[in-house]
């Protein structure tokens, strides 16, 4: 089944989805991309009420706190969860922002999938050069401390139920990507890491998240400290 693209044609996607639900008996909608997850979250109440379907994603007020990378980093800072130094980036605060994060650093859009819009900058001149085009293309964003990582990434996958309990968790240690410099994981192992599970579950508790969430974690090479990078708010 082919449907309109939710990002480029949100109205047509909505019409398609509602027609499909009216004609097809569906019990649960499980969004598999950031775009569909955001749309389902924004329209969750209507879809569940009219079509009698359950949407496996929180309402948008909660969803947005995880999906928006700036809001997530601000939350981590408030509650003391490990994360890279991150600050809102605007045309007027480039010098102040870079003084906080230091160089090298990453320009990161608040809303993006994968590595889209992420730009590495190693000095203030480069930041001044590339920021306008990144902002024009991807919208609001942050400047984030560049993590010299160990070469290993972690995915922490959790399911928090409506009673605040963790119904399941998995920690995946990603050893290799394709392409090699960053992409889709192609060599991973499941590991036991209660520390990572506890850190990530505490974040979900603070935003009252219900359902599945997938954290991306880096490990700093020199200190061995973990850093929350983002949440993929979908299955």
List where the protein language model places each region.
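Conserved metal-phosphate-binding beta-hairpin within the catalytic cores
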Residues: 205-235
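Glycine-rich, highly charged phosphate/nucleotide-binding loops
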Residues: 1-20
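Protein kinase-like catalytic core scaffold
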Residues: 105, 165-167, 225-230
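Active-site nucleotide/adenylate-binding loops and adjacent lid/helix of ATP-dependent enzymes
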Residues: 63-150, 160-165, 194-197
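A short, GP-enriched loop/loop-strand-helix hinge that lies immediately N-terminal to
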Residues: 2-4, 24-67, 82-85
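ATP-dependent carboxylate/phosphate-activation module, predominantly the ATP-grasp catalytic core
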Residues: 125, 129, 133-134, 145-208, ...
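Active-site charged/polar residues at nucleotide-handling catalytic sites that mediate phosphoryl
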Residues: 23-24, 101
């Amino acid at each position: 089944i082919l449907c309109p693209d939710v990002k480029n044609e949100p109205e047509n996607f909505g019409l398609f989805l509602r027609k499909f639900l009216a004609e097809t008996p569906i019990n649960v909608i499980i969004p598999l991309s950031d775009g569909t997850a955001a749309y389902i979250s924004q329209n969750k109440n209507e879809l569940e009420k009219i079509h009698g379907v359950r949407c496996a994603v929180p309402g948008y007020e909660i969803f947005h706190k995880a999906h928006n990378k700036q809001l997530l980093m601000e939350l981590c800072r408030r509650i003391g969860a490990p994360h890279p130094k991150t600050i809102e980036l605007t045309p007027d605060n480039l010098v102040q922002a870079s003084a906080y994060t230091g160089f090298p650093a990453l320009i990161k859009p608040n809303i993006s999938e994968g590595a889209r819009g992420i730009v590495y900058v190693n000095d203030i001149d480069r930041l001044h050069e590339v920021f306008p085009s990144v902002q024009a293309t991807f919208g609001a964003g942050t400047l984030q401390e560049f993590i010299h990582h160990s070469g290993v990434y972690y995915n922490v996958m959790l399911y928090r139920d409506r009673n605040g309990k963790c119904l399941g968790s998995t920690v995946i240690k990603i050893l290799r990507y394709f392409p090699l410099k960053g992409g889709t994981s192609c060599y991973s192992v499941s590991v036991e890491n209660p520390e990572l599970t506890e850190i990530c579950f505490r974040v979900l508790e603070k935003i009252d998240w219900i359902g599945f969430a997938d954290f991306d974690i880096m490990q700093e090479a020199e200190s061995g400290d973990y850093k929350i990078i983002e949440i993929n708010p979908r299955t």
